[in-house]
A protein has these predicted regions:
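Membrane-interface segments of envelope glycosyltransferases acting on lipid-linked substrates or membrane lipids
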Residues: 1-126
Length: 126
């Protein structure tokens, strides 16, 4: 398997299925001695992460303010470049927009959309 640097982007790590999946994937990779990253606004589940191989970078990715997305996207892009990230897993619509608005690079992106409450808004469907 070729080496890769993964970053997962999730709004928060407080509680829930998305958060549990994020922590489980990060710790699984750490058990395999694969350094990986999480960008999040914070949360109580951070303490469940392997401190040696899972690196948490806090940015306001839980923001619902669409006008802040380009600025946050640029910060994400700088993080991706500084850490030689070649795989991004976006786990929410807001961060997906942020990643989409950042400058284009050769990073593969996976987006997971968890639709629990319905999807009536045009912007939420994008």
């Amino acid at each position: 398997m070729s080496s890769f640097n993964l970053v997962q982007i999730v709004p928060s790590l407080d509680s829930g299925g998305v958060e549990r999946g994020t922590v489980d994937v990060a710790n699984f990779l750490a058990q395999k001695k694969i350094k990986n990253f999480i960008i999040t606004s914070g949360g109580k589940m951070i303490k469940e992460l392997d401190d040696n191989l899972v690196h948490v970078h806090q940015l306001p990715v839980s923001s619902k303010n669409f006008f802040s997305y380009p600025s946050i996207g640029r910060k994400i892009n700088k993080f991706i470049q500084a850490n030689n990230i070649n795989l991004v897993h976006v786990r929410s619509r807001g961060p997906a927009w942020m990643v989409n608005l950042m400058s284009k690079n050769n990073v593969k992106t996976i987006a997971t959309f968890h639709n629990v409450y319905g999807c009536n808004s045009f912007f939420k469907k994008m």
